[in-house]
Structures are given as C-alpha cells and as structure tokens.
C-alpha cells in the first residue's frame, strides 16, 4: 500500500510483515479467540458484552408477557361419551 510520510511517497511493501506490533496483535487476537472459545463451551450465554440472559434483556420487556395458549378451532370435543343429538324437532315430551 502506498502512503505519504514527511512529504515522501513510501511503499508499504518495504515494511516487514513480522514487525513487533503485528506479532503482538496476532498474539492477542489468538489469545482472545481461545479464551472466548472455551468460555462459550463452559457458559454458552456469555458474549464479549456479558451474559445475554440477564433480566434486563428478556424478549418481553414491553410489558406484554409471553404469548398465551394456542386457540382451539372447530367444535369443543372433550372426548368423553357420545355427542349430543341434533336439536331438530322429532320425538319429544308431548307423545
């Protein structure tokens, strides 16, 4: 990469890729990766910002609460005994 320093055009290729700052950045990058890898195995809810399951970061912060039970569709059927006869006319009490 070309850049200007003190009025001179310098080519970035002349810099060594094994300079000390690169090596320390690489070391800390690998160290952070290894630490976060093992922390995620031991405590899966931990991220770089902290625990994700804290009480302040729940899904229902807006006061609605969790959703209710699913609604029933169709007839109510409790599964006990025969169903009631139809309500059409026919034999009754006046015979």
UniProtKB/Swiss-Prot annotation:
Disulfide-bond pairs as recorded: none
Membrane topology label: Single-pass membrane protein
Keywords, ordered alphabetically: Calcium, Calcium transport, Cell membrane, Endoplasmic reticulum, Ion transport, Membrane, Selenocysteine, Transmembrane, Transmembrane helix, Transport
A cellular-component GO term for this protein: plasma membrane
Entry's localization field: Endoplasmic reticulum membrane; Cell membrane
Region (Disordered): 47-95
InterPro entries referenced in this protein's UniProt entry, alphabetically: Se_SelK/SelG (IPR024491)
Transmembrane segments: 20-42
GO biological process: calcium ion transport; endoplasmic reticulum calcium ion homeostasis; protein palmitoylation
Entry's family note: Belongs to the selenoprotein K family.
General function of this protein: Required for Ca(2+) flux in immune cells and plays a role in T-cell proliferation and in T-cell and neutrophil migration. Involved in endoplasmic reticulum-associated degradation (ERAD) of soluble glycosylated proteins. Required for cell surface expression of CD36 and involved in macrophage uptake of low-density lipoprotein and in foam cell formation. Required for palmitoylation.
Protein name: Selenoprotein K
Gene: selenok
């Amino acid at each position: 990469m070309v850049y200007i320093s003190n009025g001179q055009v310098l080519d970035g290729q002349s810099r060594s890729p094994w300079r000390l700052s690169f090596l320390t950045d690489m070391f800390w990058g690998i160290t952070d990766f290894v630490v976060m890898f093992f922390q995620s195995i031991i405590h899966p809810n931990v991220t770089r910002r902290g625990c994700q399951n804290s009480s302040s970061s729940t899904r229902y912060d807006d006061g609605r609460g969790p959703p209710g039970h699913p609604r029933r569709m169709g007839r109510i059927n409790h599964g006990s005994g025969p169903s009631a006869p139809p309500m059409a006319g026919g034999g009754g009490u006046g015979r």
